[in-house]
Amino acid sequence: MSTKKVYSFLSQAFIFSAIMLVSNIIATHLPIPMPSSVIGLVILFSLLCLKVIKLEQVESLGTALTGIIGFLFVPSGISVINSLGVMGQYFVQILTVIVVATIILLAVTGLFAQFILGKDDKEIEDTKELKVVNKGRKHGKVA
């Protein structure tokens, strides 16, 4: 029988609200503009990794919010539509920034992936070489 504890909607909402309150306070005191939602995600991720908050404590509300995420983006979409006049004036600049940022993002992601994969391949090769050397020593052969 499962002993998984079910947390109430209210307790989960309190956890999310407390994290958002703290992230709003942090965002107002930072010297650079940073969205409080990003700070909140970092705080939530950190608390989950450090096991201060258990996944069960926020899982069902998180799943519910993920289910309605499209609805949550409606206000952002409306504000973009309201800004089409401004965006039309700077279309070339906006398009240039989007294309350049996308290329930089792809390049950095690719280089980082190659670095990580190359590091793993080198560790595998080093491990294989070490096994061959150790195997030779067992049989009285020195490499």
UniProtKB/Swiss-Prot annotation:
It holds the Pfam family LrgA. InterPro entries: Antiholin-like_LrgA, LrgA/CidA. It is found in: Cell membrane. Keywords: Cell membrane, Cytolysis, Membrane, Transmembrane, Transmembrane helix. GO terms for biological process: cytolysis; killing of cells of another organism; programmed cell death. It is a multi-pass membrane protein. Its main location: membrane. The chain crosses the membrane at residues 6-26, 30-50, 61-81, 97-117. GO terms for cellular component: plasma membrane. Belongs to the CidA/LrgA family. LrgA subfamily. PANTHER family: ANTIHOLIN-LIKE PROTEIN LRGA, HOLIN-LIKE PROTEIN CIDA-RELATED. Inhibits the expression or activity of extracellular murein hydrolases by interacting, possibly with LrgB, with the holin-like protein CidA. The LrgAB and CidA proteins may affect the proton motive force of the membrane. May be involved in programmed cell death (PCD), possibly triggering PCD in response to antibiotics and environmental stresses. This is Antiholin-like protein LrgA.
